Amino acid sequence: MDSLTTLYKNHLDTLQERTRNVLARFNLDALLIHSGELFNVFLDDHPYPFKVNPQFKAWVPVTQVPNCWLLVDGVNKPKLWFYLPVDYWHNVEPLPSAFWTEEIDIIALPKADDIGGQLPAARGNIAYIGPVPERALKLDVPADKINPKGVIDYLHFYRAYKTDYELACMREAQKTAVNGHRAAHEAFLSGMSEFDINLAYLTATGHRDTDVPYSNIVALNEHAAVLHYTRLDHRAPSEMRSFLLDAGAEYNGYAADLTRTWAADGDSDFAALIKDVNEEQLALIGTMKAGVSYIDYHIQFHQRIAKLLRRHQIVTDISEEAMVEADITGPFMPHGIGHPLGLQVHDVAGFMQDDTGTHLAAPAKYPYLRCTRVLQPRMVLTIEPGIYFIESLLVPWREGPFSKHFNWQKIEALKPFGGIRIEDNVVIHEHGVENMTRDLKLA
């Protein structure tokens, strides 16, 4: 395996090539990429946690420093103005010296407002990519060159194809997240509350709650029926039945996004259902290959859900085909099979069919699917099927012609467990699929 230094150099070559292409297409001279700024809470002097512009961290693994700027033209060495104030109130990150810094021209920026005097005087043909349009206007960037849609679409489309450097970073993020999942599982087995399980996860990963790529979902019992449950009860429930953990990690700005579900009683019906969802998830991943639409895999898993609903007698006296046709599987798995993953957890361009931004929406029957692209080598996606017992989604089925097929007694018995989700992160290769999560032996 090449060193991170070599991988990064090749990664930069790829970004430079993409930059040359997008500048030529839109007749631009350069891209000015802003890391972002701190924004204060309304009527307060405390800022919100800083979240870096993902287009900025695509170039350099600087994720915690606002007021930084990159100027790239696809030919010359990228220039990074690194914010380095004299400040005794707050910690100041030193000028970076790492595996990547030889490839970047790094200039200290002591005062954020001084960037105007550092940039080229002629800015009429430079595109600003960043979260603060007002700042770009003050720098005399024309309004039509502030986050121009065509440029953003082009950059987003090709972000789906990960470089070897990006894949290496994502594998490292996996390792960190797997450590967290193992620690959280131990905390669950010891009877901890959601709040304390989350602390165990953060300790094992070395992350603060503002460092994780998304808010950890730490759901005990019926809380697992809330897809994005983030409340974190301080008290452990009187009876531990189930635990769903959806939590990730970051490495150099790249995300991992893993989910596991455990049953307190390994001999319960719920534990058997977890086992079967896990087996079907792995079976689906085993069929994945380049050249197939992600939509197809989503539909295929609804067929697998139908099989499990019949096997576990949750839905009875109706064929699997009829179940999928009538969308009886829908209330049990109301989300998509997964999404693109990378610099962002729900990575960009999941619906984009080409580098001009052509959009293909999710099928009307499955509106929450986050990706409609044909899979290609170097794409990274999550595969995260689930079966849930969500009363608000089941209510419409309690009446009508299909109600008789629902085993309501079995469903009521399973509702206190909330639901199941199992999520791995996979890389599409030319001749197969790499399951980064299972490669680390996370059961």
Curated annotation (Swiss-Prot):
PROSITE patterns: PROLINE_PEPTIDASE. Keywords: Dipeptidase, Hydrolase, Manganese, Metal-binding, Metalloprotease, Protease. Mn(2+) 1 binds at residues 257, 339, 384, 423. The keyword Hydrolase applies. One of its GO terms (molecular function) is aminopeptidase activity. GO terms for biological process: proteolysis. The keyword Metal-binding applies. Binds 2 manganese ions per subunit. One of its GO terms (cellular component) is cytosol. Mn(2+) 2 binds at residues 246, 257, 423. Disulfide bonds: none annotated. It catalyses: Xaa-L-Pro dipeptide + H2O = an L-alpha-amino acid + L-proline. SUPFAM superfamilies: Creatinase/aminopeptidase. Its cofactor is Mn(2+). It is an enzyme of class 3 (hydrolase). PANTHER family: XAA-PRO AMINOPEPTIDASE 3, XAA-PRO DIPEPTIDASE. Belongs to the peptidase M24B family. Bacterial-type prolidase subfamily. Splits dipeptides with a prolyl residue in the C-terminal position. This is Xaa-Pro dipeptidase. It comes from Cronobacter sakazakii (strain ATCC BAA-894) (Enterobacter sakazakii). The gene is pepQ.
